[in-house]
Curated annotation (Swiss-Prot):
Stored InterPro entries: DUF350 (IPR007140)
Topology relative to the membrane: Multi-pass membrane protein
Highest taxon, organism lineage: Bacteria
Keyword Membrane tagged: yes
Family: Belongs to the UPF0719 family.
Cell compartment(s), UniProt: Cell membrane
Pfam families per the UniProt record, alphabetical: DUF350
Name of this chain's protein: UPF0719 transmembrane protein Mb2631
Keywords for the protein's UniProt record, in alphabetical order: Cell membrane, Membrane, Transmembrane, Transmembrane helix
Ranges that cross the membrane: 21-41, 62-82, 92-112, 131-151
Keyword Transmembrane: yes
Source organism of the structure: Mycobacterium bovis (strain ATCC BAA-935 / AF2122/97)
């Protein structure tokens, strides 16, 4: 009679632990980039963006903040994907590209404010959804796409 046996070999948790540490560190860098993006939008828009989004529930502020998060997430994901196999170098790259993404998103918002008729900033705290917020959202996503493509 034959006995069924399964050989699992040696199990090493080292690669898993390295992956967990890398995941946590990339999360922290990514979260810092998102916070920087939120602060940048808060600086460029009238009023307290946190209050406009989470307390007053102003739809234009919500769309702008949410789109900024998605746009910066696209840049951060692309930066992680293109990052070095060396963890420290990869984290530095993601942080640098993330800050560049925040800066370019800010530049795009300023250019949009200058280039289009009217003042979109005046509609951020409006209780009604303004159509210009969608044009602004698409522009932010387009900028994120260009940055992400440049990283690949």
């Amino acid at each position: 009679m034959y006995q069924a046996g399964v050989d699992f070999g040696t199990i090493s948790l080292t690669p898993i632990l390295h992956g967990v540490v890398a995941t946590v560190l990339y999360f922290l860098v990514g979260a810092a980039v998102l916070v920087a993006g939120f602060l940048m939008v808060n600086l460029l828009t009238p009023g307290d963006l946190r209050r406009l989004v989470f307390i007053d529930r102003r739809p234009n502020a919500v769309v702008l903040a949410a789109t900024m998060y998605v746009a910066l997430a696209i840049v951060t994901i692309a930066a992680i994907y293109a990052s070095s196999n060396q963890l420290a170098q990869g984290l530095i790259g993601v942080a640098v590209y993330g800050i560049v993404g925040v800066a370019l998103q800010g530049v795009a918002l300023v250019i949009l404010e200058i280039a289009v008729p009217g003042r979109f900033r005046e509609h951020i705290d409006a209780p009604a959804l303004h159509p210009a917020v969608f044009a602004t959202a698409v522009m932010l996503l387009a900028v994120a796409g260009v940055i992400a493509a440049a990283l690949s």
